[in-house]
């Protein structure tokens, strides 16, 4: 993860961001709210260049290497930037995290993907894959979230 120190010791976190197809079509507002929230909470989402659909479903066949390549491209770009990869779409998170695990642990898949992509430096699962909510929980923290709330819902009945 790429951390830079801001004024008064506050950390500025920068993540590679994989929005996914759904956040570009049906969930544009969710994407906009996540980006705005990230700014308020002191971290930046730097969108992966030329990302492609992850496929939405993890391919179980080990011979289906082509279906994993878009995820490997995104993971490799994050690695080259020295950043963790964040996504907000749960399907993308699942697919990319599983492909990353394959690249880390399954030699045949790793070799075939790297041979196909002809990367300068082979990718071997070095990137940390996070869901946006994991960043909020584990990196930003609940105390910071509470501090940044503008309109608290105290006294409101929610889902009752």
Give the ranges of each region predicted by the language model.
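Iron-sulfur cluster-binding electron-transfer modules in prokaryotic oxidoreductases
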Residues: 2-160
